[in-house]
């Protein structure tokens, strides 16, 4: 990732769009469909770089994956017939691929090595390794904490585990490993995190029990898995950039269709409403993974908010662009209890503050979040995504508050989750002219 992009978009934005399929759900659907013997079709998947790394790894395990225009067809021999890979399993920039497959491959007992790019090599893996070791996984890393992760065969045991942080990746690694245990596993969450692993377990016929913050799997749950087709909703994390772009750009009026609004992911909608933003939902579907059309209009004079507690995991990936939105509030805003931001593609507390402060905004990082003061775009300094796709897109949205072009280094990082981001933003601008 090394190309720069000069952003020269001003709005207003008008029209109707859809955003790419949800990244979290695409990863998990690929994994579960690959475990199930037979054919599964995943419709409207995200075909960004992260999800391609997950696909590539299952191909190395013996799964046939065929890409079509708006779907992927997965023809699996079943987990019982996976082959041992004879090369390093490269996860690229994908923390989801790395952490979830650490659990899944430990459960499968397949000798393997997981390794990613330079960014992944800096991200700690101890939080996922700790519970897996309690489950008798044979897994080790560099300094017991970093990739590459070396996995060797072992017999996975069920555990009772109290989560120490609200992390869907850690939770999912435990649940995926537990599928292969002869004992039940009981997991209690710290705060409820995104539940796509649980909803997709049920979709692929894997028994799972959920009572409040407590989740339980049954012994050898993997034996129940069946191939299934799955339609991936639009990613609310991708929609977030258009939501904020419309809210801060005078004259904007947009609708984003078929966006996933799973309650464990829809924190940004609640935050925008608390700020007095003009946002409405329509065409709301029901089910484990509900969707809606999101209608957003420009809103001046936004209210100040404090974002904390269980609202944080429900908006964790959107917090950088929410921080940008908070610079346009009438008074100072606070984000707290967001330590999880430190172990994303970058330390997003520091990166968000550093990059926005370079542009003249006023953000103060804290040990667990940010204090964001009302402030304006004052400098067209060159900024850098730091190879973080969400930082890159957040900075592109920040440029809307300037009348001058903005140069963003390493902007190709956005291809991790949204390869067509800029063309879609320009499309809405063209409709607004």
UniProtKB/Swiss-Prot annotation:
What coarse category fits the chief subcellular location reported for this protein? cytoplasm
Q: Does the keyword Transferase apply?
A: yes
Q: Which reaction does it catalyse?
A: 3-phosphoshikimate + phosphoenolpyruvate = 5-O-(1-carboxyvinyl)-3-phosphoshikimate + phosphate
GO cellular component annotations, sorted alphabetically?
Answer: cytoplasm
The record's section on InterPro entries has: Enolpyruvate_Tfrase_dom, Enolpyruvate_Tfrase_sf, EPSP_synthase, EPSP_synthase_CS, RNA3'P_cycl/enolpyr_Trfase_a/b
Question: What does the record list as GO biological process?
Answer: amino acid biosynthetic process; aromatic amino acid family biosynthetic process; chorismate biosynthetic process
What are the protein's UniProt keywords?
A: Amino-acid biosynthesis, Aromatic amino acid biosynthesis, Cytoplasm, Transferase
Q: Name one GO molecular function term.
A: 3-phosphoshikimate 1-carboxyvinyltransferase activity
Q: Where is the active site?
A: 317 (proton acceptor)
Cite the annotated pathway: Metabolic intermediate biosynthesis; chorismate biosynthesis; chorismate from D-erythrose 4-phosphate and phosphoenolpyruvate: step 6/7
The subcellular localization recorded is: Cytoplasm
Specify the enzyme's EC class, one word: transferase
Enzyme Commission code(s) on record: 2.5.1.19
Does the UniProt entry include the keyword Amino-acid biosynthesis?
A: yes
Annotated CDD domains = EPSP_synthase
Task: Provide the coiled-coil residue spans.
Answer: none
Q: Which PROSITE patterns match?
A: EPSP_SYNTHASE_1 (PS00104), EPSP_SYNTHASE_2 (PS00885)
Entry binding sites for 3-phosphoshikimate: 23-24, 28, 167, 169, 317, 344
UniProt family annotation: Belongs to the EPSP synthase family.
User: What PANTHER family does the record tag this protein with?
Assistant: AROM/DEHYDROQUINATE SYNTHASE (PTHR21090), PENTAFUNCTIONAL AROM POLYPEPTIDE (PTHR21090:SF5)
User: How does this chain assemble?
Assistant: Monomer.
Entry function: Catalyzes the transfer of the enolpyruvyl moiety of phosphoenolpyruvate (PEP) to the 5-hydroxyl of shikimate-3-phosphate (S3P) to produce enolpyruvyl shikimate-3-phosphate and inorganic phosphate.
| Entry protein name | 3-phosphoshikimate 1-carboxyvinyltransferase
Name the species this protein comes from: Staphylococcus epidermidis (strain ATCC 35984 / DSM 28319 / BCRC 17069 / CCUG 31568 / BM 3577 / RP62A)
């Amino acid at each position: 990732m090394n190309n720069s992009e000069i952003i020269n978009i001003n709005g207003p934005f008008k029209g109707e769009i859809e955003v790419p399929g949800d990244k979290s759900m695409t990863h998990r659907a690929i994994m579960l469909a690959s475990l199930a013997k037979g054919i599964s079709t995943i419709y409207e998947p995200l075909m960004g770089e992260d999800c391609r790394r997950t696909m590539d790894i299952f191909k190395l395990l013996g799964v046939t994956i065929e890409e079509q225009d708006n779907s992927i067809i997965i023809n699996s021999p079943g987990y019982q017939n996976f082959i041992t890979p004879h090369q390093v399993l490269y996860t690229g920039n994908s923390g989801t691929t790395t952490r979830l497959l650490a659990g899944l491959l430990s459960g499968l007992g397949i000798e393997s090595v997981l390794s990613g790019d330079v960014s992944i090599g800096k991200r700690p893996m101890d939080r996922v390794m700790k519970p897996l070791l309690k489950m008798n996984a044979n897994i080790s890393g560099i300094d017991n904490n970093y990739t590459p992760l070396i996995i060797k065969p072992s017999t996975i045991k069920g555990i009772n585990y109290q989560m120490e942080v609200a992390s869907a990746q850690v939770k999912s690694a435990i649940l995926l490993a537990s599928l292969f245990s002869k004992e039940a596993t009981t997991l209690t969450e710290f705060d409820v995190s995104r539940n796509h692993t649980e909803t997709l377990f049920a979709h692929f016929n894997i028994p799972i029990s959920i009572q409040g913050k407590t989740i339980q799997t049954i012994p050898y749950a993997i034996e129940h898995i069946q191939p299934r087709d799955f339609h991936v909703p639009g990613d609310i994390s991708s929609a977030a950039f258009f939501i904020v772009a419309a809210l801060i750009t005078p004259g904007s009026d947009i609708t984003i269709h078929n966006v996933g609004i799973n309650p464990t992911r829809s924190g940004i909608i609640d935050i925008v409403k608390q700020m007095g933003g003009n946002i409405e939902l329509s065409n709301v579907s029901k089910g484990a993974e509900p969707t809606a059309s999101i209608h957003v209009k420009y809103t001046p004079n936004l209210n100040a908010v404090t974002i904390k507690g269980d609202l944080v995991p429900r908006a964790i990936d959107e917090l950088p662009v929410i921080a940008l939105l908070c610079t346009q509030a009438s008074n100072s805003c606070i984000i707290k209890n967001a330590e999880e931001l430190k172990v994303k593609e970058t330390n997003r507390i520091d990166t968000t503050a550093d990059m926005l402060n370079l542009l003249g905004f006023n953000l103060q990082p804290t040990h667990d979040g940010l204090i964001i003061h009302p402030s304006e775009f004052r400098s067209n300094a060159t900024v850098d995504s730091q190879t973080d796709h969400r930082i890159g897109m957040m900075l592109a949205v920040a440029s809307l508050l300037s009348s001058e072009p903005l140069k963003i280094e390493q902007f190709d990082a956005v291809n991790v989750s949204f390869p067509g981001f800029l063309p879609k933003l320009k499309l809405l601008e063209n409709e607004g002219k």
